[in-house]
């Protein structure tokens, strides 16, 4: 009976890294692992002391999606009546 109770407790035990891999921080499309897989590269360290492994193909898709459209040397010919100055608020300091 004791063995049965121990078996039930072990079945409901959830491992910390078993269910899902933790994602890396700072908007990096990678996962924290002990070793990187083939086709992945090491980006930065995770908080848990593991490596942040980034898949090269997924990173290219992510960077091209987030990259804003740049104008090819075109200058705007619109004249403004005022000058836009940078402002600093109390909350920004």
UniProtKB/Swiss-Prot annotation:
Principal subcellular localisation of the protein: secreted
Cystine crosslinks: 24-52, 32-46, 36-53
Subcellular location: Secreted
Gene Ontology terms: biological process: defense response to bacterium; innate immune response
Taxonomy, superkingdom: Eukaryota
Keywords: Antibiotic, Antimicrobial, Defensin, Disulfide bond, Secreted, Signal
CC terms in the record's Gene Ontology section: extracellular region
InterPro entries: Beta-defensin (IPR050544), Beta_defensin_dom (IPR025933)
Coiled coil regions, renumbered to chain: none
Signal peptide segment: 1-18
Known function: Has antibacterial activity.
Family, per entry: Belongs to the beta-defensin family.
Protein name in the entry: Beta-defensin 128
Source organism of this protein record: Hylobates lar (Lar gibbon)
Lineage of origin: Eukaryota, Metazoa, Chordata, Craniata, Vertebrata
């Amino acid at each position: 009976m004791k063995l049965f109770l121990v078996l039930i407790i072990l079945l409901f035990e959830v491992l910390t890294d078993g269910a899902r891999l933790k994602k890396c921080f700072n908007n990096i499309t990678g996962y924290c692992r002990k070793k990187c897989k083939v086709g992945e590269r090491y980006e930065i360290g995770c908080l848990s002391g593991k490596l942040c492994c980034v898949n090269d193909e997924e990173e290219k898709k992510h960077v091209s999606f987030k990259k804003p459209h740049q104008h090819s040397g075109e200058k705007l010919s619109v004249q403004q009546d005022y000058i836009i100055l940078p402002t600093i608020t109390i909350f920004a300091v």
